[in-house]
Every structure is written in structure tokens, then in C-alpha cells.
Amino acid sequence: MIGEYIDIDAPYSFIGGGVLEPEIIDGLWDFWNDPAMETLFEKTPGHCGGMGEQINKEVKDSIDMTIPRYIKDKRICSYIDGLAEITREYVNYWPMLRTIHWDLQSDFNIQWYPKGGGFKQLHCERNNADIESVTRVMAWMTYLNDVEEGGETLFDIQQAKVKPKKGLTLIWPSDWTHFHKGCPAPNEEKMIITGWYNLVR
């Protein structure tokens, strides 16, 4: 983690995070472009979670790669270690989270967005009655590249718009209080890695 904990400047936003080292992010790019990984983990058009998992590019225009939680690839493990460091700072900022039993236990995704792409519809991360969804406590996301024009993540209720910066990692509650969407970047591609912390027994 580079520097100190970041609290997104919006009243009680509960959106925070930090910045990961460039070499960690470069490792994720290497993983994405690794032909050996493409044979193991298929890249597929992005599905619209909570909408019957259909593909609709008017809602979500992306290519996604799902990564198993317990993969042993050094590039992914290095990222998970960095995410854990930022998560500890988030919990230090919101210490009531220590009273809840949660962990990183579900698979997660690297998502590539073409020019003009994005998850363009407001959505939250706990959006149906599936056990995977209802146990989500927090979402997390890291931007894998800088975007000069557009590409922001808009948190609607908080009226917070976060500009993509390589390594910037955000954590936020998974509930309806944090409906958000991705603003299209008209002239640039965008890449993120994203997933959830879930309740555990």
C-alpha cells in the first residue's frame, strides 16, 4: 500500500481504500495477458448480475475473467496480500466491522471495458436471494489503469464520483445504500479487478 488510508470525501460515504504498488497491478495485467491463464480461465462477455445473468451490452459492456478464490498464482496472491493490507486500514477506520464474521471466500473477476463500455446501470452488490449475494458484506475494486476522460465510478446516493487511477482500491458496503455505476470512457479502455467479502460461519 502506498501512503495512508483514503476516505472518499462524501458525508458518511463508507467508501474508502488506498493505493496499491504499481508492480502488483502490473502483475495483474501480466496475468490477464498470459496465454496459459486464458486456457484455464475463460474470458466471457460480462453478465448483468441480479438480472437473470443475461448479457446486455446496453447495461454492461465488458469482458470478464473469473478467478478462483484459492488460486496459487503468485501474481494473484500478491494482489490479495495488498488488498488485505488496505482492508485492515478500512476496518481500522470502521472498527465495528470487527464484530461481524466475514472473509474473502468467493471467486472474483478481472473486467476489461472497451472504449464507451462500462456497467452503465445503477446496481448494488446484494441484489437477489442467492446465498452468494445475500451473504455479501462489502464490495472491493481496484482500478488497473488511469483513465483521463470518463470512466469514473458514480455512487448515486453519496453523489461521489471516483476517477480511475492505477492501483486505487475502493471498499464499500454491498447494500442498496451504495447503488453505483460505471461512467463510460469514450476514448479509452478501462480495467478493474473486483469482488466481495462475505459473511462466514
What do these predicted regions represent?
Residues E38-T39, F119-K120, V147-L154:
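Substrate-binding/catalytic groove segments of enzymes
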Residues W32, P95, P114, R126, ...:
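Short beta-strand segments enriched in hydrophobic/aromatic residues
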Residues L104-G118:
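A short glycine-rich, His/Asp/Glu-containing loop-to-beta-strand
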Residues F119-N127:
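Histidine-centered catalytic micro-motifs
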Residues I2-H101, Q105-D107:
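Non-heme Fe(II)/2-oxoglutarate
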Residues V134-R136, E149-R201:
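Catalytic core of Fe(II)/2-oxoglutarate
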Residues I110-P114, A129-E149:
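Short, conserved beta-strand element in jelly-roll/cupin
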